[in-house]
Structures are given as C-alpha cells and as structure tokens.
C-alpha cells in the first residue's frame, strides 16, 4: 500500500522517500550523439548508486531517485527510444585503452546507444560498408525519396531491436515507463471549437506517439493523472528481449522503431515515414495545456463518411517528417506526466521539490541575429527567411523556459554542451567558442566524421557528470529528502551559492556520484578531419549529387526535351555546384577549427577572430571581399579585420594566405580573397571593364 508523508511526498510502505525525474530530449540531428552521452552517464551514475546501496556503503542519501518518463523530438526521440532498449539489458562497459591516472576509465556504458549514434551513422564509411552517401537506395531504378541514403537509419533501427540478451530491469526505472515521441503529421488532424453562433475550424500537424514501455524497470510508479488517461500504446520489453532474427521481431516493436525514425526524418535530407494508427488514439489524446481536460478535451472532426464514433474506430495513416520541425523541445509532455494534480504546477522550491524535468538541449548556439538591412528585399531571400522565421517561432516557448531559468526553480533543469578545458594551476577557465563538433552545417556536421560524434558523446558524459555534481540539486535542509548528518560534507558534496538577494544557501546533489561514476570523465580532444578525408568526402558528395539529380530528371519529368535540357544544365553546372558545396563545408570546418592543415600564423590575435575572417573569405557567395563586408559578416571592428588580413597576407605558402587584388583604384575599397581562390586570368583581365558583362566575373561585396 502507498501512503503519503505529512509533507506530501509520495512514499511506499517500508521504502524511502522518492524524487521522480523525467527527461526531455530536444531535436539535434547528428548532435543527438551528445544527448546519448548524457543519458549514458546518467544511467552509469544511477547504476553506481544502486550498487553502493546494495553493498551497504555509508553516507548515501536517505531517499531514492526514480525515472518515470521520457520525451524526444527528432534525434531526441531516437535517443530516447534506443536508450530505453539499451537500458533494458546489461552490457559490460567499454573502457579507454590508456586512461589518465585518477580519471574515468569508462568510455561508455550503453553499447547499443553508442553504436547507434557514433559508429553507424556516417557520410563516408571507413570500411566501405553502406553509409549516408551510398547509392544502394537508388538501385533498381527506385525513385528518390531523400537526398541522403536513409537505409542506413533503417539498419540502425533494426540493430537496436536485436535485443537478444537477457532482460535485466533496473530498480530505478518505472515498470511502466512513459515515452513520448514528437511527429510532424503532413496529413494533419482536423479539429473544431464550437462557439455560440458558429464553430472555428483548424488543423494541427503537431502529432506524437505515446508508448508505455513495460518491464524495463521494477519501480511501481506513482499515478500520473495526465499520462495514465492519455492515449498510449503498451509495449512489453519481455516480447523483445530473447527474440532472435528479423522474422521474430514483434510487430509492435517494429512500429516503435518506425515512430522513432519518423521523428528523426529531417525533411528532404532523410526519407519520410508512414505512421499507421487509428482514430481512437486521437479521441483519447490529451494536450499538455493549462486548461483542465478532465471533462472537456478537443475531439477531432473526422470526415462524415468515416462514421467515427465512440464505438466505431477507423484506421488512420499519415506521412511523418521530423518531429522537431514543429515541437523541437517536448518539455511539456514530461512535465505534465510528472504532475500530481494537473494542470497545477509541481512544487518548485528547493526545500520542497520532489520531482523534476531534465531537458537535454544539444544546441547552445542560438540562431544568428540579422544585421540592419537583412534579409535583402528579394523574392528568394524573403522566401528563405520566412521558412526560418516560422521554424524559430514554433520553438519560442517563454512560458515553459522562463520557469527553468528562474533562480529558485528546482523542478526544471537543463543540460547543454559546455566545452571548458581543464585550467592550469592558477589559470582561469575559459569556455571555448564552439562546444560540440556536430554543430556545423546546422547539425548535420556530425555525420562527416566518427571522431566528431565520439567527441560529442564523451562531452555529453563529462557535462552530465558536472551537471549531477553542481546543478541537479536540492536544498541541504529539504523537508523530506535528506542525507545522513554530515554525510554530504564528508563526501565533499555541499554546494554553497550566493543568491541574487545576497543570501547564502547550501545545496546537495540529488544524485550522488559514487563508485565508478565518481572519477572525473576526461576532457575529450577536439576532433579534426584531415585534408585527404575531406577530399574523399567531397568526391563522394559529388557522386551522390549527380546520381540523385539524374534519377530525379529521369523519374520526375516526362518531356524528352525537358530531360535533355536539365541534363545539360547538370553537365555545365556540376563543377560550380560541387565547388559551392566544398567551400560551404570548408568555411564551417575552418571557422570551427575542425580541419587539419589550416594552422594560423603566430600573432597576438584571438584565434577565433582570425578563423572568422578566414570563414568570410571562404564564403562561396563572394569571390572577393572588402574589409567592411568582412566586418559586417563577422561582427568584428573594421580596424581589427584590417589587422587580421595584413597578418594573413604574410602567411606565405599556407592555406590561410590572403591575396590582395592588384587592380583596385585608390578611391575604391581594397579587395581580398585567399590565394587559393584568386580569380582566373580572364576574370582579372576583364575586372571593371565593360566586356566583362559578357563573361562571368567575380562577385564582390562592394557595398
């Protein structure tokens, strides 16, 4: 039987007080490797605590922490889904070959999760196995359904379901674990709200699937008024573990994997997925909103011909793409699942909070802030910006996120990438400009190199360790959740903080670091691609580009004349397109210091400023740059840009050597580019002359 302590904390007879957690994982594309690393270390820390309790170790907290819910969008959904399966079994942790004395020797705990995020999804496979640039998905004349070979992700999903080991439930995971995965439903679901005098019709494309995973854990969870009455599909871990071979994989788990891949189906880049469900799932669906839905909830207005009613169900299928397109931060689903009495918020005070949402957000770098006069008043530039604006707006959730940032809130936490090199004795710690290696190309960059993804996985583990030690805390004098007298001090776990009102408060970690979770996770070495690997990458991209373009021309056009014209355009424009892609890749790799062969000249200049100028010179939109144009792009002072350009001009023979156009008149601004990008002889000869209008000439940002 369950009983409540006088302070309201849910307890079980004969057990300790419980602190409940839920994890929300944001969309991240290839930076999902970071979220996976965070989850990996969290499982390691909770395992180590359970082991210490079983061994009777002293000075441990007198309460338990339990995992009740997960939610994810895009890469976050894939991480949550595979993480749940990985947590159902036990693999021996992988270790570093030569760990530093006193540092963490464990490389990863959840091998299935590591392989899914680090080993498998890559643009260029080092061993020749199928990768994201392979052409196997186009074999046999099949049509193009995505720019990249999404068969790789299908294979990852299939491998994740190969849970042939023994099911080993974890004591700190709910026996009925709620998992929400976000979907972008391209078909849409119609709704109507009735008013006096009429009705308002609308369509939602923000969809989700809700699974209740049975048997991954043994903790009998407390009731969830929101999730327990929401439409959810129960799925048993026992039906997966022990299954052997593709033919015996349970269909409900195949649907589970398909939903996770659908949530991660980035539009155009990765193939969409078809989700098969039924209208009854929507009749019971609840929304994480502040209105009470106990007696009234929105009901879809399906077509009359379907004859949908309380007793009549109807099959409903739809095409789904990236769930992060509409809801990239599914924080609210976990928050409502943890609520005792929704929509009333949980207790937030550090002395009373007994449940919390942990949000994993892999992209700490916000969207760029446009300068004056941007975007230009052109049709294409406005169209591009409208799409970006809509996407950024749906991610703007001040009502949810402001509460996370509030100083006194201890029921909502966020962990995001921070790359801070260990300081030398007496030195000052300084966070690096770029935290994750997967951040380039809008998040696709992690697929460039396995070392990029491994770096982010290890950074996730390191950041999680610091987060558990310093940020996931409660007041030392919490009403119901206590450490033994003096235990936190003996473990050197007390964190003293000065609040904005000047008062000093002592906090203790909610999850203690003990056993193999205590040694420091090593600082991962920043990963770089070598020039040969980069050249191979560009070559493989070109092969995929040409194959996809030719297949599109073949399957999407019926006119022979049109096919001939498009193939001719591909022939004459191929080199220009490939060069644009090469420069775009190189621009970001150089700016983020993620490619070898680009050492900077010795100078008293900040390296990240120098790389920003180099990136501006590599911008494929311009052939020649002015000091003012570079300053506008980099947000650096013009005098600093001039100093950097002068320094780079002296880097003879280096990739970073700058070239100054010799034809510039004294009354015009100087023009710069890299030596490797000098205009051709013809373009140089015709620059500024009227015949140049008949030929392609360099693009210059004179204004």
Curated annotation (Swiss-Prot):
Positions of short motif GXSXG: 72-76
Membrane protein topology class: Multi-pass membrane protein
Active site residues of this protein: 74 (nucleophile), 322 (proton acceptor)
Position of sequence motif DGA/G: 322-324
Keywords: Cell membrane, Hydrolase, Lipid degradation, Lipid metabolism, Membrane, Plasmid, Transmembrane, Transmembrane helix
Segments crossing the lipid bilayer: 23-43, 69-89, 143-163, 250-270, 357-377, 432-452, 644-664
Subcellular location: Cell membrane
UniProt protein name: Uncharacterized protein y4iI
Natural source organism: Sinorhizobium fredii (strain NBRC 101917 / NGR234)
